[in-house]
Amino acid sequence: MASPKGPFGNGPGPPVDRQWTQTEGILEEERDTTMTGRLRILGVVLAVFGLAFLAGGAYTFYRTQEGARSLQAFSAAQQIKLSYNEQGQLVDRGKTEEAQGILSLLENDWGYPVVASDLNPNDPTVNTASEYMYQMATIAYHTMHGTQTVVLTEPKEYKGTTYPAGTYQVPVDGRYFSQFDRQDPLQGPARDQAWSGTAHALIAELGVGTMTATSLQMGYGLAGLFAGIGLTVLVAGLGLVWAARPAEEKAPKTRAIPQPIPA
């Protein structure tokens, strides 16, 4: 039987191409194996980071819950509650008009974005940022819309005007502490009476409550952010591990070859 012709004449050709193909296959398989291993390692690292973020989110949520319970207990102990009528409308001193005036001061003059859902008649205890700010505005509103009684025991003169001794009713007229003329015989005492140390202390305390409630809301937001990032990274890591898993090699199917029947 004649030998197959090679590229340079009779006889078998050199097995160079076949040998190179086998080597290339081995190298490619090794590269695939190395890359698969790296992907698995990366997937495990991502999964660990995801679990860390989930743990951070859970811890942040737990600590925020503790702060919210503490703030609720503080407000309940002080009996700080908002007033609502039978229709569920916010009132102040029994009047909805007063409450609307306070809200107008809070939203229009101070520019605070009141969250309507925070003003809940079913939960009148002050424990949200909007409720604390409403209480702060209530003190400022009544202070600025009040009238102060000033008693002069002797005549006073200021800027060419003489104020005889007597009792005077001085309207605050919507003025803040810094908007009074403290040297005026009537405005000076009226300022100290209207914007007393008690009013300033209450506003400061309510301001702390507002910041605390706002910080708690940010805490819940951070907890959700950590949990979302953690879940995303965890799923991505597990997906890489699953995608880079070793392929299952199936045994080749065998087929019976019919044998010739001897004569």
What are these regions (language model features)?
Residues 17-23, 68-69, 123, 247-263:
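Intrinsically disordered terminal tails
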Residues 55-94:
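Membrane-helix exit/juxtamembrane interface segments
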Residues 70-73, 137, 141, 204, ...:
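Charged/polar, solvent-exposed surface patches and flexible loops
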Residues 174-228:
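Short, aromatic-rich amphipathic segments at membrane interfaces
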Residues 2-70, 228, 235, 241, ...:
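Hydrophobic secretory-pathway targeting helix
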Residues 34-41, 213-263:
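Juxtamembrane interface at the cytosolic side of transmembrane helices
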Residues 83-197:
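Long, solvent-exposed extracytoplasmic domains/loops
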